């Protein structure tokens, strides 16, 4: 057993989760289904969103935000997450990257990019999102 091996396997396990379960949840919300995204978010406060459309703090505001997003989004034709950096530190992790999305927003087809930074906690052996900051990149 070497410490480096544990760190690499922990990071690879996290990245596999990001590229599968997290990715699926993002596609779902852009198709109008908030349930998969809500399932990957922590049910323990604090949880926060500094969003491109709206901010949220705490469970009630998070639920309201996700319901609003699900009502706004539909017809996702493309979602790509360009991961710039990710790190796992014990039971915490983060990702930084660009989200490239093509979906309808309030019925109008749009293609846009967001800068996204997310912080995760391991809870009951599962990764959960605790914070998200999404914003449009500078021109």
Q: Where is each model-derived feature located?
A:
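Conserved catalytic core of Hanks-type protein kinase domains
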Residues: 40-41
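A beta-strand edge to alpha-helix "cap/lid" segment located at domain peripheries
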Residues: 3-36, 46-139
